[in-house]
Amino acid sequence: MPELPEVETVRRSLEQELVGRYFVALRSLGWPKIVDTHSPELFAEAIAQRQIQQVQRRAKYLLIELDNHETLIVHLRMTGQMLVVAADEPADRHTHVVVALDNGRELRFHDPRKFGRWSLVDRSGVAALNQRLGPEPLGDDFTLDDFAQRLSRKATKIKPTLLDQSVLAGVGNIYADEALWLAKIHPLRSANSLNANEIAELFEAIKTVLRNSIEHRGTTLVNYRDAYGASGENQYHLEAYGRTGEPCRRCGTPIERIVVAQRSTHICPVCQA
């Protein structure tokens, strides 16, 4: 599933293509369940001739703000892609939503697994989303003191705590592994067992791995692409995730795969002991 760096990379590419443009018409909605707030007919009517004001991100969600104060919230889930292409470019069978733009291009949603969702909401819908999410780890409201307080209230293991979107918004399996490796913390440690120095190390590690991945335009393992269909490059810079059996770049010990909270997890058994 795309995590914060991937969704931020998509956001930036969509921003270049969409801000100031108009949704002209819904060309097709091949899988109606993708839009979970409106029928196809009402959705088509609601977005027609609406100008795009901003493209923002909250956690793993894209927020496309329209000129009538409504917002299209897009959750890519496992395999969703938001692509902006020429209208004459052929669409394959996994393209489930096509929206015409006023410059002759199209916004397309490509999703082989069909788990992605579009929700057209008013301001209260955006507020409800914000209310259930924790702070943005690259935002000003992510402070060391607040992070320490949140961890102190959690007796759960640190790995699933980092994946809890009400604790921290946007971190998923890849970057939890990467941050814990960088901070030299074992993922099975209880969140409330970390001392002040460990919390500070993890706080900085989370920001570092996310910023580095954004710089590399995200991690493409299978499906992730930006709005131009381009892959990310962060998969070539991972330290722990997906590197089972390969040497730890700090100590040379083979990276091991374990399961934590039913999630595949990658650790250095020496550095993170």
Curated annotation (Swiss-Prot):
Keywords: DNA damage, DNA repair, DNA-binding, Glycosidase, Hydrolase, Lyase, Metal-binding, Multifunctional enzyme, Zinc, Zinc-finger
Cofactor(s), by name: Zn(2+)
Top-rank lineage group of the source organism: Bacteria
Active-site residues from the entry: 2-3, 60, 263
A Pfam entry, by short name: zf-FPG_IleRS
GO biological process: one example: base-excision repair
Annotated residues for binding of DNA: 94, 113, 154
Cofactor note: Binds 1 zinc ion per subunit.
Reactions the enzyme catalyzes: Hydrolysis of DNA containing ring-opened 7-methylguanine residues, releasing 2,6-diamino-4-hydroxy-5-(N-methyl)formamidopyrimidine; 2'-deoxyribonucleotide-(2'-deoxyribose 5'-phosphate)-2'-deoxyribonucleotide-DNA = a 3'-end 2'-deoxyribonucleotide-(2,3-dehydro-2,3-deoxyribose 5'-phosphate)-DNA + a 5'-end 5'-phospho-2'-deoxyribonucleoside-DNA + H(+)
Gene3D superfamilies: 1.10.8.50, MutM-like, N-terminal
GO molecular function, one term: damaged DNA binding
SUPFAM superfamilies: Glucocorticoid receptor-like (DNA-binding domain) (SSF57716), N-terminal domain of MutM-like DNA repair proteins (SSF81624), S13-like H2TH domain (SSF46946)
Function: Involved in base excision repair of DNA damaged by oxidation or by mutagenic agents. Acts as a DNA glycosylase that recognizes and removes damaged bases. Has a preference for oxidized purines, such as 7,8-dihydro-8-oxoguanine (8-oxoG). Has AP (apurinic/apyrimidinic) lyase activity and introduces nicks in the DNA strand. Cleaves the DNA backbone by beta-delta elimination to generate a single-strand break at the site of the removed base with both 3'- and 5'-phosphates.
Protein name: Formamidopyrimidine-DNA glycosylase
Species this chain originates from: Herpetosiphon aurantiacus (strain ATCC 23779 / DSM 785 / 114-95)
Lineage: Bacteria, Bacillati, Chloroflexota, Chloroflexia, Herpetosiphonales
